[in-house]
């Protein structure tokens, strides 16, 4: 008994000692820091570390009721926090214990089924420790239900879902474990402890815990790189396989991590980011039910597209959406605008897209899943006040409302989201421009109410950043100097057709500094009492508002709030005060910045434009200081723009024109009559906020060529200005530029280029001259129609007119008949013997042309009349002599190119230019049918070749002088073709035509043949004044079966059908007939000239037809090689075929040479001029026009000159045996099934005339 009691007392004392030790350890925990001191833990997104007091109170207090029951329970020094939490999945209540890291165990989170299990676990642990100390048997321990090692966790986050409001989401390596707290304080407590323990555990594992980096930047950067990743806002999402998730193979389970500047996608079981997306690269985000989506831009590593993610429920998706928007707004508030370099075009383009998207917001397309997208920034964006910084505006879908004031650092900035591109002008309320008007140095006039209900409209339809001069306010210069970087203050931008704010004018009547010649001016509301700017008016032609006769563009103000004395603007923009309205800045849309910022003293320095970075990477420097003097005599002040600064933009901007779709002609006429009835000096009442008037829903602005000084080099760029028609001139029912159907007729602009000058070295300051104004531009700059073509073009510098006319003549005939004064409906193209037109004014190397044609070289091909000539474009006159008429292109160039079809012609090299200078041309001159055309003359032509010219006196005559200057002894030289064709035609030319060709067989070319570079041939119909401009490849089609070349205008229903055969399949094309005759030619001994034409036929045989299966016999190669003559290139053959189609008289020469003029029409070279006279006498040839004749030599003697005909017949060789003829079927009306207008050129017709155009069925 005594021994038993002694043993029991000893165990009791041992237990008491253990309890005392546990109490001491607990006291030590209370009085000492729980965690080792180190670098403060900064949570990403918070910027602050966890307070140490929270640790102290959390470790000792904040216990639940279950903990208070067992306060005397020794839990050990490693327990940091314990309490009841619920599991998210099923809502089961579990007892969670957070333990610190010890020497034998890492930091961990454990949970038990209840507190009683935890107590038993603690007692079992104590008993095990005692047993281990005494050497007794160790009782079994009670393990927890789960242990989560914290250093292996990815992150922890707070959130809420549809069921629970206070969630603690713990992300392990491979799963997502969420706990539910009872209240917000409990949630915050657990989150702070977990986040700090996770981060310190990771640091300890990485060896960075307690490391104090030096102050050196390299050490700080190294420490930051070694810092383990930790994210505050994390969601586990399932990326759906749609959009980018499908294209980039991003579908699956990801951790979506949001920081202050970026979004990171991390896969399971790793901490390395898979995709990193900058927040500024996100175009929009939204949610629908349990789906959250992001639309990213092209600056991301995965490219543009959408990412659709599935989350727990709709509440989580909504919270994600709100948090993303909050981060985006924070970036905007912190002036983080790196995206300006990535895809924002300019401030003006931002405003354009924002305003234009207003009309289309009601038609938001559905997403692939069927949900509507929520626009970024909750479908609104911040518009900061530009000059005064009074308040901020939130530009919503339908209205503009003021918001909270903004900091001074945000003043002068405009941040707009990227929206859809649209070129339609829309209107905004007056409050928008009232807040945009900079007026820091000007007090508000007492008579001006803060809200006068005035509506301002702004037409902004350009796509670039125009630059304007500074206003007269003292702070304008400071605003420009202080706004560096990627931003452009609103008082410096202009876009295309107008400027939205004209604020900052003083009270001394100075000129407007914000008018752009492309459109209307809308000035701010708070002008001075004597300011010359209309506060809310608008020019009816899209021009300057005016209050005191200040309209720089001549347009009368039409808005409310004008002074009674205002109204019609002075012609040059001169204000009644002392401010110029015609100086300064530049407009991106293609006009002069008229009235752009001359101060009261006319200081030109204020007109300097501040250049900013834009989407196109660069903008040209202002050239208004480099303006050349105007040519004598100087024109009067123009009504459409100032004389300072070139209206040229950078980056190859396009010139857009609005299309009048909505308003009818009756509405226009009624509007014109109504505007004409209003007196000029009367003030008009406020109108509703439309772009132009309340009757028209379409903001159409008639355009005309702007006033510009001659450019340094000839250019395709045309400064444009609105067609300003005053009220007294608007009584006519229709614009002079509209045709009978109500369409605005646009024609290529013509501005006089400077005189010929030698090429200059490239100037680095004028790099845009070579890019924006190069002749290889893809765009043809247009001007409105009929009246713009002068009857007597003036060119004070003696140079030729613009090169853009060749692009105009490539248009279909219905688009070119009206402005030239041709009232007939004939599609026939008469021609006149042409002249060479030099290329000295072009940027290309001029080719060698005959000096005797210099006298006949025209000085210009037509140009628009300058406004200085009377202020209105002149009209053509049918009674003027032909020398005063607008000339037409007179050269058709046939060139062969290489293997590939190039979509855009490159600039020719020096070798290519030298090769082109000696290439073969067909010169045509187009003139009126009534003109008296002299017969073609053969004087001065080479004696080595005869000229066959037979001018027949009929409506379709005046044929052709054709000269083949073929240097037989020198195969290196090309042929020189000169085709002078019949008069009176609508010119029909093609910019470019390409079709594939098989390679030319060696047996057909001979040893001295000119080798072609590839399998393609390029036929270019082009003016001598204009380099080649490629059409779309799909616009030219060749049908090998029918032998037709279809030239289809992609913008109309017109089509030109150049037929090489009379029918589809019944008769072989001319090339096939040539191949049939070639069999006969091979059996005959070939003379020098005949071998030449045999080689020509062999070259033509490369043309793609159905007869290409025939292989040329090698027997013709030795004959060709022995002749030592170059083969007739396909360009010459096509030129010859074109000539024969228009000149049936040359068929006599072909018949005299022994060829069938109906099946194969070729030229017969003659020895000298006498032989040419002999051949001219042969008009009717049995082998050609008379198929039944069997004696061509006898028929040759029936001409006018019997002796010459006999001589030619005696010298002519025997004709070859006639091949099998295929009967010509009758022409069918419904041969073409398309409903297009065809101009059919049949090279196989016997009557050698064109078919009249007919409408296909």
Curated annotation (Swiss-Prot):
Regions of compositional bias (Pro residues) in chain numbering: 627-640, 750-761
Domain PH: 78-199
Biased composition (Basic residues): 408-424
Sequence segments annotated as region (Disordered): 406-653, 678-921, 1179-1257
Distribution of this protein across tissues and organs: Expressed in myoblasts. Expressed in liver and hepatocellular carcinoma.
GO molecular function, one term: phosphatidylinositol 3-kinase binding
Record Pfam families: IRS (PF02174)
Example GO biological process: insulin receptor signaling pathway
Residue positions where Phosphotyrosine is found in the record: 921
Main location as per UniProt: membrane
Motif (YXXM motif 6): 828-831
Location of the region described as GRB2-binding in the Swiss-Prot/TrEMBL record: 895-897
Membrane protein topology class: Peripheral membrane protein
GO cellular component: cytosol; plasma membrane
Region (CRK-binding): 678-800
Signal peptide range: none
Mutagenesis / variant outcome for changing residue 717 to F: No effect. Reduces interaction with CRK by 50%. Abolishes interaction with CRK
UniProt short sequence motif YXXM motif 4, positions renumbered to this chain: 743-746
Ranges of biased composition (kind: Basic and acidic residues): 763-774, 840-855, 1236-1257
Biased composition (Low complexity): 510-524, 800-810
Annotated motif YXXM motif 3, positions: 717-720
Record InterPro entries: IRS (IPR039011), IRS_PTB (IPR002404), PH-like_dom_sf (IPR011993), PH_domain (IPR001849)
Disorder noted: Hypothyroidism, congenital, non-goitrous, 9: A form of central hypothyroidism, a disorder characterized by sub-optimal thyroid hormone secretion, due to insufficient stimulation by thyrotropin of an otherwise normal thyroid gland. It may be caused by congenital or acquired disorders of the pituitary gland or hypothalamus. CHNG9 is a congenital, X-linked recessive form. Patients have a small thyroid gland with low free T4 levels and inappropriately normal levels of thyrotropin.
Entry function: Acts as an interface between multiple growth factor receptors possessing tyrosine kinase activity, such as insulin receptor, IGF1R and FGFR1, and a complex network of intracellular signaling molecules containing SH2 domains. Involved in the IGF1R mitogenic signaling pathway. Promotes the AKT1 signaling pathway and BAD phosphorylation during insulin stimulation without activation of RPS6KB1 or the inhibition of apoptosis. Interaction with GRB2 enhances insulin-stimulated mitogen-activated protein kinase activity. May be involved in nonreceptor tyrosine kinase signaling in myoblasts.
Name listed for the protein in its UniProt record: Insulin receptor substrate 4
Gene: IRS4
């Amino acid at each position: 008994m005594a021994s038993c009691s002694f043993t029991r007392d000893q165990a009791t004392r041992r237990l008491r000692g253990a309890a005392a030790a546990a109490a001491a350890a607990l006291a030590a925990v209370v009085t000492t820091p729980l965690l080792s001191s180190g670098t403060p833990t900064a949570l990403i997104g918070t910027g602050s570390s966890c307070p140490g007091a929270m640790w102290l109170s959390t470790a000792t207090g904040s216990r639940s009721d279950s903990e208070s029951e067992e306060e005397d329970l020794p839990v050990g020094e490693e327990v940091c926090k314990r309490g009841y939490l619920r599991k998210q999945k099923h809502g089961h209540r579990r007892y969670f214990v957070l333990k610190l890291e010890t020497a034998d165990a890492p930091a961990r989170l454990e949970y038990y089924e209840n507190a009683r299990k935890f107590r038993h676990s603690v007692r079992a642990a104590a008993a095990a420790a005692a047993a281990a100390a005494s050497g007794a048997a160790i009782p079994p321990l009670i393990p927890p239900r789960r242990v989560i090692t914290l250093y292996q966790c990815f992150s922890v986050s707070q959130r809420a879902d549809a069921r629970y409001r206070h969630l603690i989401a713990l992300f392990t390596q491979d799963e997502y474990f969420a706990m539910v707290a009872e209240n917000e304080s409990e949630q915050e407590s657990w989150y702070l402890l977990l986040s700090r323990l996770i981060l310190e555990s990771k640091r300890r594992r990485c060896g960075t815990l307690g490391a104090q980096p030096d102050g050196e930047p390299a050490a700080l950067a190294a420490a930051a790189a070694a810092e383990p990743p930790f994210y505050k806002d994390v969601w586990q999402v399932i990326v759906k396989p749609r959009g980018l998730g499908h294209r980039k193979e991003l579908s699956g389970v990801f951790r979506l991590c949001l920081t202050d500047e970026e979004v990171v996608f991390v896969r399971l079981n790793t901490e390395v980011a898979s995709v990193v997306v900058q927040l500024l690269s996100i175009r929009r985000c939204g949610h629908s039910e349990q789906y959250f989506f992001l639309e990213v831009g092209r600056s991301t590593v995965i490219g543009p597209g959408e990412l659709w993610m599935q989350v727990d429920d709709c509440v989580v998706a909504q919270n994600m959406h709100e948090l993303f928007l909050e981060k985006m707004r924070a970036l905007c508030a912190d002036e983080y605008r790196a995206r300006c370099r990535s895809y924002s075009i300019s401030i003006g383009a931002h405003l354009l897209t924002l305003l234009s998207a207003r009309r289309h917001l009601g038609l938001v397309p559905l997403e692939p899943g069927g949900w509507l997208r929520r626009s970024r920034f909750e479908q609104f964006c911040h518009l900061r006040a530009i000059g005064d910084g009074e308040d901020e505006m939130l530009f919503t879908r339908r209205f503009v409302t003021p918001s909270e004031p903004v900091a001074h650092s945000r003043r002068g900035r405009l941040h707009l989201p990227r929206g859809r591109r649209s070129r339609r002008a829309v209107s905004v309320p007056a409050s928008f421009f009232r807040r945009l008007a900079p007026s820091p140095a000007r007090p508000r006039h007492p008579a001006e109410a803060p809200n006068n209900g005035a509506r301002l409209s702004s037409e902004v339809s350009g796509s670039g950043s125009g630059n304007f001069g500074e206003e007269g306010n003292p702070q304008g210069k400071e605003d420009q100097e202080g706004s560096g970087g990627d931003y452009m203050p609103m008082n410096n931008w202009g876009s295309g057709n107008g400027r939205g704010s004209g604020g900052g004018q003083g009270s001394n009547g100075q000129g407007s500094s914000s008018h752009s010649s492309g459109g209307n001016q809308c000035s701010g509301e708070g002008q001075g009492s004597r300011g010359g700017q209309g506060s809310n008016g608008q020019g009816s032609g899209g021009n300057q508002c005016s209050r005191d006769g200040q309209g720089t563009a001549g347009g009368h103000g039409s808005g409310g709030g004008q002074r009674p004395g205002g109204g019609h603007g002075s012609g040059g923009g001169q204000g009644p005060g002392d401010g110029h309205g015609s100086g300064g800045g530049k407009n991106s849309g293609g006009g002069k910045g008229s009235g752009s910022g001359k101060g009261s003293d006319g200081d030109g320095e204020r007109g300097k434009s501040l250049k900013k970075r834009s989407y196109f990477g660069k903008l040209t420097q202002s050239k208004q200081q480099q303006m050349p003097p105007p040519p004598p005599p100087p024109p009067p002040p123009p009504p459409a723009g100032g004389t300072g600064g070139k209206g040229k933009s950078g980056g190859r901007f396009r010139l857009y024109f609005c299309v009048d779709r909505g308003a009818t002609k009756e509405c226009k006429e009624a509007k014109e009559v109504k505007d004409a009835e209003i007196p000029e000096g009367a003030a008009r009442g406020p109108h509703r906020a439309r772009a132009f008037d309340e009757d028209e829903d379409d903001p159409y602005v008639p355009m005309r060529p702007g006033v510009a000084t001659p450019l340094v080099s000839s250019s395709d760029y045309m400064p444009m200005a609105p067609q300003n028609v005053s009220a007294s001139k608007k009584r006519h029912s229709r614009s002079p530029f509209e045709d009978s159907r109500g369409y605005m007729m646009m024609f290529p602009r013509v501005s006089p280029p400077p005189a010929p000058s030698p090429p200059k070295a490239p100037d680095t300051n004028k790099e845009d001259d070579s890019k924006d104004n190069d002749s290889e531009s893809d765009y043809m700059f247009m001007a409105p129609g009929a009246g713009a073509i002068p009857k007597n073009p003036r060119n004070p510098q003696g140079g030729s007119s613009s090169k853009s006319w060749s692009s105009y003549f490539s248009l279909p005939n219905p688009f070119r008949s009206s402005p030239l004064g041709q009232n007939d409906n004939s599609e026939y193209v008469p021609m006149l013997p042409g002249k060479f037109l030099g290329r000295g004014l072009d940027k290309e190397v001029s080719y060698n042309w005959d000096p005797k044609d210099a006298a006949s070289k025209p000085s210009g091909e037509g140009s628009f009349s300058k406004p200085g000539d009377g202020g209105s474009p002149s009209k053509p006159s049918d009674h003027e002599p032909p020398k005063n008429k607008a000339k037409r292109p007179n050269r058709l160039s046939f060139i062969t190119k290489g293997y590939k079809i190039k979509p855009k012609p490159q600039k020719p090299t020096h070798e290519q230019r030298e090769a082109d200078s000696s290439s073969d041309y067909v010169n045509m001159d187009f003139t009126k049918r009534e003109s008296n055309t002299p017969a073609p003359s053969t004087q001065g032509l080479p004696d080595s070749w005869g000229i066959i010219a037979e001018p027949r006196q009929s409506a379709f005559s005046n044929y052709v002088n054709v000269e083949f200057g073929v240097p037989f002894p020198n195969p290196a030289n090309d042929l020189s073709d000169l085709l002078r064709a019949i008069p009176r035609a609508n010119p029909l030319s093609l910019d470019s035509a390409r079709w594939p060709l098989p390679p030319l067989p060696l047996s057909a070319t001979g040893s001295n043949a000119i080798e072609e570079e590839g399998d393609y041939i390029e036929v270019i119909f082009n003016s001598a004044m204009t380099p080649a401009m490629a059409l779309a490849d799909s616009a030219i089609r060749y049908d090998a079966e029918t032998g037709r070349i279809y030239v289809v205008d992609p913008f109309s229903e017109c089509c030109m059908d150049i037929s090489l055969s009379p029918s589809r399949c019944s008769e072989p094309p001319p090339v096939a007939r040539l191949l049939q005759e070639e069999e006969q030619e091979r059996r005959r001994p070939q003379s020098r000239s005949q071998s030449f034409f045999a080689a020509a036929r062999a070259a033509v045989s490369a043309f793609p037809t159905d007869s290409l299966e025939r292989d040329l016999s090698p027997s013709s190669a030795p004959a060709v090689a022995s002749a030592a003559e170059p083969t007739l290139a396909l360009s010459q053959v096509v030129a010859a075929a074109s000539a024969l189609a228009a000149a049936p008289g040359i068929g006599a020469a072909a018949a005299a040479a022994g060829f069938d003029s109906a099946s194969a029409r070729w030229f017969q070279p003659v020895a000298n001029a006498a032989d040419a006279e002999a051949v001219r006498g042969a008009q009717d040839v049995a082998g050609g026009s008379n198929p039944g004749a069997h004696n061509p030599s006898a028929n040759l003697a029936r001409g006018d000159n019997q002796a010459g005909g006999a001589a030619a017949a005696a010298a002519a060789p025997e004709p070859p045996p006639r091949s099998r003829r295929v009967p010509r079927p009758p022409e069918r009306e419904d041969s073409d099934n398309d409903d297009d207008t065809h101009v059919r050129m049949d090279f196989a017709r016997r009557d050698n005339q064109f078919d009249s155009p007919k409408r296909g069925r």
